[in-house]
């Protein structure tokens, strides 16, 4: 397709922005039914877009981008298993991971739905054996602790989801997650473990990932020291497709759970990569987790674009980043259980859309890749909200909250959850409408302080509410952002499903390792790196 920025549709949007940019949310909310008009439902989520900087004309022009970019055709192609990942010639089928068993989908001659449910069945049997006590460690003890060793998509997804759904961990099994090659990560976990009741899940598609295999070998050595070599088979399982490497490590390939090339790591939490999560929350709730994904998939696939929540949120992201010049996007869950959600979204969004060339390799001329960040409320209010409220940078924000907590405590006449949500609603209100100098002066504030206390408002927010943080709702939330990524990638005409930017650093690390460890002379090819390595070697 043509570069979207060269099209008449983009020019029309540019002209519209010139006329619209001074419009305020105070003005927009003079429309009586605005909140109702811009509130939508999707897969159990209640999504209010009304506090965003848009009106009907803006939305019409943004929706024109979807037609210009061929979004409908690309959505259909993705769900059909066409090879949208053109640089690796692969299908993009994370949506198949949550298809019902009776679904009919074949790709490249393979019955995808049958393959997915065969692996799910094996995962279910294994998780059930762990939770029931039928799977025993080498010395006959039941498993109480799972240590998931992976990195990137093999860590961020299951780690986030396991914490988010900790209220569903009812079988006495808990999980720890180790990813960093910094030895402090693994050491801090191992020092509190009982080897006899610990199971390690090594998650690496190729079983060659440097960080993961370094940690896995160290964990293996620790276990062998405690229980002996023969214990490995009962205390290690693998999520991988490399049976030869898994067997070399000492893991029985009957305890290897695979996935497919059409699943990118950052889209894999609902594949075998979620084995640790399934073991902790149980197969029934894991299937509900998948059900939430599928419900959002169906909303995305079948709902008309003007009511399609992932599409509307994606278009708003393009509007803010390419027209308002917003550089970042805050995700603010008012839920401590979602404390790792923003970190998870960083990989999902930034590894996907952090690209500078089109699908055909030509340079892009628009911005791409929103920078995602965030922390749970109310912690963020006492840290960075100052900048969002009164700073010079526009930071669109998604607020995520729930009507019912899993646990609550009294707080005087109210409950702590009610206080949490009072803050939630207050923040979106103040960000939207603020308080101007005239209103502040009318309160008797000293004139020299008025400008310091002005709250400009006009900071856009999206509110996402659900009744409760359940497995299904978490699946729907994740799928929502997966589809936002896809839509933006189509509009920018980039490949959201490769990640070549991470490869060169890996290669260079392997090349430099002998010099860093002192096995070879330092000769990196540049004087700065040489000097730094020499300092490191002299001071370690």
From Swiss-Prot:
SUPFAM superfamilies for this protein: SIS domain
Keyword Hydrolase set for record: no
Catalytic activity, reaction form: alpha-D-glucose 6-phosphate = beta-D-fructose 6-phosphate
UniProt-listed Pfam families: PGI
Pathway membership: Carbohydrate biosynthesis; gluconeogenesis; Carbohydrate degradation; glycolysis; D-glyceraldehyde 3-phosphate and glycerone phosphate from D-glucose: step 2/4
GO biological process: gluconeogenesis; glucose 6-phosphate metabolic process; glycolytic process
Enzyme class (EC, first level): isomerase
Entry's Gene Ontology cellular component terms: cytosol
NCBIfam families (alphabetical): PRK00179.1
Protein name from the UniProt record: Glucose-6-phosphate isomerase
């Amino acid at each position: 397709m043509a570069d979207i920025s060269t099209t008449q549709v983009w020019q029309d949007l540019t002209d519209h922005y010139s006329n619209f940019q001074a419009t305020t949310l105070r003005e927009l909310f003079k429309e009586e039914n605005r909140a109702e008009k811009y509130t939508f439902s999707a897969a159990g989520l209640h999504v209010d877009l009304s506090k965003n900087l848009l009106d009907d004309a803006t939305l019409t022009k943004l929706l024109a981008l979807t037609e210009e970019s061929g979004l409908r055709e690309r959505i259909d192609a993705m769900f059909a298993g066409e090879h949208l990942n053109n640089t690796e010639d692969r299908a993009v089928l994370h949506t198949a991971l949550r298809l019902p068993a009776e679904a009919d989908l074949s790709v490249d001659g393979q019955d995808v739905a049958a393959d997915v449910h065969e692996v799910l069945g094996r995962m279910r049997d294994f998780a059930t054996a762990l939770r029931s006590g039928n799977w025993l460690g080498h010395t006959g003890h039941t498993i109480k602790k799972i240590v998931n060793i992976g990195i990137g998509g093999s860590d961020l997804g299951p780690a986030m989801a396991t914490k988010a759904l900790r209220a569903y961990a009812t079988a006495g099994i808990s999980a720890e997650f180790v990813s960093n090659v910094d030895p402090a990560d693994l050491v801090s976990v191992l020092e509190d473990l009982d080897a006899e009741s610990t199971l390690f899940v090594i998650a690496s598609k190729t079983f060659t990932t440097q960080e993961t295999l370094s940690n896995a070998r160290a964990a293996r050595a620790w276990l062998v020291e405690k229980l002996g070599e023969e214990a490995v088979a009962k205390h290690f399982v693998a999520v991988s497709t490399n049976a030869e490497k898994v067997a070399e490590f000492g893991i029985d390939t009957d305890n290897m759970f695979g996935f497919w090339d059409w699943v990118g790591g950052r889209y894999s939490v609902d594949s075998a990569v979620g084995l640790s999560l399934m073991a902790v929350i149980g197969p029934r709730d894991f299937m509900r987790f998948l059900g939430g994904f599928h419900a959002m998939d169906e909303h995305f696939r079948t709902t008309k674009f003007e009511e399609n929540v992932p599409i509307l949120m994606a278009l708003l992201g393009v509007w803010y980043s390419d027209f308002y010049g917003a550089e970042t996007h805050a995700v603010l869950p008012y839920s401590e259980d979602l404390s790792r959600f923003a970190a998870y979204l960083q990989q999902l969004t930034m590894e996907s859309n952090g690209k500078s060339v089109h699908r055909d390799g030509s340079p892009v001329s628009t911005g791409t890749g929103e920078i995602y960040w965030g922390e749970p409320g109310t912690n963020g209010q006492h840290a960075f909200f100052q900048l969002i409220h009164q700073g010079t940078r526009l930071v669109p924000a998604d607020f995520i909250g729930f009507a019912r907590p899993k646990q609550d405590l009294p707080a005087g006449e109210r409950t702590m959850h009610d206080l949490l949500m009072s803050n939630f609603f207050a923040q979106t209100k103040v960000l939207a409408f603020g308080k101007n100098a005239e209103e502040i002066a009318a309160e008797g504030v000293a004139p020299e302080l008025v400008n310091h206390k002005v709250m400009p408002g006009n900071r856009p927010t999206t509110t996402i509410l659900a009744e409760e943080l359940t497995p299904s709702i978490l699946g729907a939330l994740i799928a929502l952002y997966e589809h936002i990524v896809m839509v933006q990638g189509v509009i920018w005409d980039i490949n959201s499903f490769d990640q070549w930017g991470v490869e060169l650093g890996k290669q260079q690390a392997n090349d430099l390792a002998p010099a860093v460890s002192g096995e070879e002379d330092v000769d990196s090819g540049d004087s700065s790196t040489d000097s730094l390595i020499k300092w490191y070697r002299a001071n370690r």
